[in-house]
Amino acid sequence: MRLVFAGTPLAAVPSLQRLAASGHEVALVVTRADAPLGRKRVLTPSPVAAEAERLGIPTLRVNRLDDDATARIAAVGAELGVIVAYGGLVREPLLSTPARGWINLHFSLLPRWRGAAPVQRSIMAGERVTGASVFQLERGMDTGPVFSMEERPTGDHETAGHVLDALAVQGADLLARTVDAIGAGTAVARPQEGEPTLAPKTTIDDGRVDWARSADEVLARIRGVTPEPGAHTSVDDVRLKIHRAAALRDAAPLEPGRIAALDGRVAIGTASHPVELIQVQPAGKSPMPAADWWRGVTTKDVIAR
């Protein structure tokens, strides 16, 4: 089949690579416009745009799928549109422009975690299993019938970044098999079953750790917002980012937010057992071992808030 592919971040690159290597033709790649990155704000193509260039596939770099973009996509004459984290809404008439419509690879077990941050929200909620779904795009947000779905267990220490990297590869294979089935006329899409949950985009506020929660909830929050937007707390009114932490289940309890050295480890209290801070990043500095940071803290009688 002749395809048009829409995607933007690194998580969409394995899907583009997999489809480009298949028996189908990726005639056009739609991605977000080049954006300023880094301290020097250099205009930089999206990871998908860069990969499309490497593969020699024409790109359409737009932030809105308006009438002009619709006309340019329609001119390609694709039979099927494929979306993986493009970052914009597909509305009519574009929704009906490819003969077979659009399918979307979503990184959750639909209808759970519909929205922009399914992996992050799943981990933050303490779930032990996530996965990927390929569904027919329709007007509702991630509501369309599902062609295929695969589960993936979430490890106790995996961050959202780790899980998303793994699902990007697993999902790419699932997506390619689904495209093959659609092309062969054997694909069957079934309505979503179960109670839907929503996964809105994460914000800086989502990264603030509430030490009055249990250790398990605290650690789930930290893993769910790592690497972005990142977990953080305030110590003496100075923001401290938390990159890695672990449970200290056998340690003596500490007041929620209280920081102390326990057997050479930097511990912080929660509503249950303490949590060990392993790697942190003080404001304006590079990431460092928590023990190094703690040695530089002059006032040891502190509570994180």
From Swiss-Prot:
InterPro entries xref list: Fmt, Formyl_trans_C, Formyl_transf_N, Formyl_transf_N_sf, Formyl_transferase-like_C_sf, Met-tRNA-FMT_C, Met-tRNA-FMT_N
Major enzyme class: transferase
Record Pfam families: Formyl_trans_C (PF02911), Formyl_trans_N (PF00551)
EC number: 2.1.2.9
Swiss-Prot/TrEMBL keywords: Protein biosynthesis, Transferase
Residues at which (6S)-5,6,7,8-tetrahydrofolate binds: S108, L109, L110, P111
A single Gene Ontology CC term: cytosol
Reactions mediated catalytically: L-methionyl-tRNA(fMet) + (6R)-10-formyltetrahydrofolate = N-formyl-L-methionyl-tRNA(fMet) + (6S)-5,6,7,8-tetrahydrofolate + H(+)
Any one GO molecular-function label of the UniProt entry: methionyl-tRNA formyltransferase activity
Annotated function: Attaches a formyl group to the free amino group of methionyl-tRNA(fMet). The formyl group appears to play a dual role in the initiator identity of N-formylmethionyl-tRNA by promoting its recognition by IF2 and preventing the misappropriation of this tRNA by the elongation apparatus.
NCBIfam families found in the cross-reference section: fmt
Family affiliation: Belongs to the Fmt family.
Protein name: Methionyl-tRNA formyltransferase
Native organism: Clavibacter sepedonicus
Organism taxonomic ancestry: Bacteria, Bacillati, Actinomycetota, Actinomycetes, Micrococcales
